[in-house]
Amino acid sequence: MQAFTVHKGLVAPMDRANVDTDAIIPKQFLKSIQRSGFGPNLFDEWRYLDKGEPGQESVVRKPNPDFVLNQPRYQGASILLTRENFGCGSSREHAPWALGQYGFRVLIAPSFADIFFNNCFKNGILPIVLPESVVARLFDEVHGFVGYQLTIDLPRQVVIKADGTELPFEVQAFRKYCLVNGFDDIGLTLRHADKIKAFEAERLAKMPWLGQRLL
């Protein structure tokens, strides 16, 4: 997983509350057994005028010109600003996969659904909770300024605006540690690979029948 320390990026505003995971990545795309390739179908039913299906090339589809991520001023955005209860609905991990593969590294909202919130950290995305009044001001600024960017300093736990204003945010210490070091669950486990191998060797020495294969 890519480490996260300081990130500066363009902000895209999604002025919707209660965006659920089926809106983030519709159910028909969950059939894939691969963990990649979901970025083109992020917000699929809002992003395109035609219905998408797995394996369909996005270049042949009809983009919705009114959807925020299709507007030229927000191309290349890596920070998504949105409203309360983002990521509600089913607990599909495909939702943060799609967001990350599109290019988002940071999500900012007044609140997130719990399971989605946890899944973001496990997939290298930083979800930041800010007060609703602060989020509302950020929406005004993003809409009023083309090319609006923010800097996210995770070690210091602040969002930095272009004028230098710092907006503090909270993050649980273990989640912060994992993001800063680029550790997902597998990466954390592999840090203890030597101990795991030693345990397995000791266990097999004491109980060799556990190593026998069934025919």
Curated annotation (Swiss-Prot):
It catalyses: (2R,3S)-3-isopropylmalate = (2S)-2-isopropylmalate. The keyword tRNA processing does not apply. Disulfide bonds: none annotated. Its EC number is 4.2.1.33. The keyword Amino-acid biosynthesis applies. Pfam families: Aconitase_C (PF00694). GO terms for biological process: L-leucine biosynthetic process. Keywords: Amino-acid biosynthesis, Branched-chain amino acid biosynthesis, Leucine biosynthesis, Lyase. Pathway: Amino-acid biosynthesis; L-leucine biosynthesis; L-leucine from 3-methyl-2-oxobutanoate: step 2/4. Heterodimer of LeuC and LeuD. Belongs to the LeuD family. LeuD type 1 subfamily. PANTHER family: 3-ISOPROPYLMALATE DEHYDRATASE SMALL SUBUNIT, 3-ISOPROPYLMALATE DEHYDRATASE SMALL SUBUNIT 2-RELATED-RELATED. This is 3-isopropylmalate dehydratase small subunit. It comes from Leptothrix cholodnii (strain ATCC 51168 / LMG 8142 / SP-6) (Leptothrix discophora (strain SP-6)). The lineage of its organism: Bacteria, Pseudomonadati, Pseudomonadota, Betaproteobacteria, Burkholderiales. The gene is leuD.
